[in-house]
Design a protein with these regions (language model features):
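Positively charged
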Residues: 1-175
């Protein structure tokens, strides 16, 4: 089932999420619905708060790992920095160069509640950081300079008014 994606201005996006405690059938259904929503959008990652669920969980597919679920993520060892364009399903349309670690480790739990650890480089590292920001009540525009934030919000307004077209989003399969 596709779940409506919450958009910039929704308070759930600015609220730190709570830990996942119940790894049950309801969580598995939610993960499947989130993946379906992410692919439909299209996007490469989707966090609980983006669908109105204030729990520390996200789903992703970077085109290499396949559909993956992560609960209660904690970011660990990080290395290097890279600035690449970044967008967000909750800020539909605009992209802006955003500084992130080039490589980062993410520890959390899978759908069974078992511990998992993954190290991401490039796009996967960006996904880990972007989605974890959502769980902390932050959006990618919170990482931008005042000038960058204004540029993203101005582009979003132009899109809303029909004066600009939203940029095509990246899909997990690269198309």
């Amino acid at each position: 089932m596709i779940i409506p994606i919450r958009i910039l201005g929704d308070p759930v996006l600015k609220t730190p999420a709570k830990s996942v405690e119940d790894f049950d059938d309801g969580l598995r259904r939610l993960a499947q619905d989130m993946l379906e929503t992410m692919y439909d959008a299209p996007g490469v990652g989707l966090a609980g708060p983006q669908v109105g669920i204030s729990l520390r969980l996200f789903v992703f597919d970077d085109g290499v790992t396949g559909p993956t679920f992560m609960a209660n993520p904690e970011l660990g060892a990080a290395d290097g920095e890279i600035v690449e364009e970044e967008g967000c399903l909750s800020i539909p349309g605009p992209f802006y160069p955003t500084r992130r670690f080039a490589t980062i480790t993410c520890r959390g739990q899978n759908l069974a509640g078992d511990p998992v650890e993954m190290t991401g480089e490039g796009l996967l590292a960006r996904i880990f950081q972007h989605e974890t920001d959502h769980l902390d009540g932050a959006l990618f525009i919170d990482r931008l300079s005042e000038e960058g934030r204004k540029a993203v919000l101005a582009e979003l307004r132009r899109i809303e008014l029909g004066l600009a077209e939203p940029r095509q989003r990246r899909r997990a399969d690269g198309e």
